[in-house]
Amino acid sequence: MRVAFVTTIDDEAIEDDVDLDLEKLAFAAAGLELHLAPWEDESVEWTSFDLVVVRTPWNYVEHLPAFRRWLAGLDATTRLWNPAPVIEWNLDKRYLLDLSSRGVAIVPTAYIDSVAEFRDSVSSIETGEFILKPSISAGSRLTGRFSVGDPHAESLAMQIIGAGLIVMVQPLASSVDHLGEIGTVVFDGEVSHSFRKGPILASGGELIGGAYREDISPIRAPDDVLALVREASAVATDHLRAMQWMGRDEELLYARFDVVRLDDRSPALLEAELFEPCFFLPTDPAAVDRFVTAVLARLAG
C-alpha cells in the first residue's frame, strides 16, 4: 500500500526531522511504500495514495493562506490523517479555550489583539516573567520570554498584532528552567512514549545559545502528567467527534501533548499538537513500531 507523508519543498525547514530515518525503515519492513510529498507540489495526486499523513509541512506559518487553500482544496476522497477540519482547528492555539472550557487544566493564557489589552494583561502578571507568542506559530517563531516592564515585549506584541495575528500571553512556569516540558505522544488513542524538552527561551526575547535548538531526552512521565494527557486526548477527541470532524468511533491517528508544572506543582497543558508534531521517536525504541501499527490499522479500516 502507498502512504504519503505531507512535507515541504523547503529542505531547511525539515532538516531537523529526527523521525524520518526510523519511519522509512519501519514502513519498509511493514511492506508499506512510503512517499514524501510536499504540500506545495501541485503535481501530486493525493487521491492516488491509500493514506496521506500530515507530518512535516513545517513552513506553513510563512505561507499560511496558501497552506489553508491546499488543505481546503483536497479532494473529499483523499484519506487524510489527521483530517483537514482537525488541522484547521489545531492551527490556531485558541483551541486551548475549547479544551479549558471542557475542564482540561491549561497554562493560564490571555488572548489579545490590541496594545492596550497587552499592557493590561502584563500588568496583572505576578510571576515576574511571561511568555509572548502568536496564536498561530511553530518553532518558537515570534516568541519570547520577558520580564514585566521589558520594552522589547511590547515591540514584539506590536509586531504580532501588525501581522494580523492574535497575541498570547502566558505567565512563565518557573519549573521549565529545571524540569523542562514533558511531551507525550499518543497513537490511535493510546499513550506511546514521553520525553523531556529542555528550555529554549532566554529572558529578554532571545533563544538560549542564540539559536533554536531542542534539548530532548527520554523520560517516564509522572502519573499525574499522564492522567492529564489522557484527559486532554479524550476531551479533544470527543470535541472533534461532536463537531463531526471525525467519525463517532474514530481516534486521532497521532497527537502530542506538551505539559508543564505550574508554580503550585500541578500539571497544565501547554499545547496539543494534532497535525505536525515531531514524535522524537529515537527516545523510545518501540515508538516507531507503535506508529506503524496505528497506520496499518487505519489502512485496514
Where in the sequence are the language-model features?
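ATP-grasp fold ATP-binding core
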Residues: 99-100, 126-143, 165-178, 195
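Short acidic/polar capping segments at secondary-structure boundaries
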Residues: 10, 85-87, 113-117, 135-139, ...
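Phosphate-binding site of ATP-dependent enzymes
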Residues: 147-242, 260, 268
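Conserved N-proximal alpha/beta basic substrate-recognition cap immediately N-terminal to
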Residues: 2, 9-113
